[in-house]
């Protein structure tokens, strides 16, 4: 985006919506979370204006001074859950509910936190780890998009999610 749009006009962030396909044409909504946003260079009033438009549409929005912390916060949960659930072809809750998956997720998150903090973020190890497990519990019946990709023999997001951490670290 920054190649064609001035950085002062770019607003970045993430959102959390869970869904699981039930059958062709039918999806079960499994959760709605917060939409996080901010900017590295855009004026704060532009970010606030965008946030207000999303709030008027019914979304819960949080504007962050350090949006990269919020982006890493969600990425850490994805690092813990998505790859592990795809590898084991399980629902999200298995990551927190199985001692071996729990431990593997801990190691993945710890490594990613080290990379995030080296990139200038200020993430609390214990809080981030607990958040990843909490997401696993809160979305325990969700079949992650990566599991769906494995099931349907499609390319997964592993290079985007865990691969991003590897490229930065």
Residue ranges and their predicted role:
Residues 20-24:
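Short, charged, surface-exposed secondary-structure boundary motifs
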Residues 1-18:
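Rossmann-fold NAD(P)-binding glycine/threonine-rich loop
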Residues 12-15, 66, 128, 161:
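Proline- and acidic/polar-enriched loop/turn elements at helix boundaries
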Residues 45, 55, 106-169:
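NAD(P)-dependent Rossmann-like dehydrogenase/reductase catalytic/cofactor-binding core
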Residues 19, 70-71, 132-133:
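Short secondary-structure capping/turn micro-motifs that flank functional sites
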Residues 4-9, 25-125:
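Internal alpha-helical scaffold of NAD(P)-dependent oxidoreductase catalytic cores
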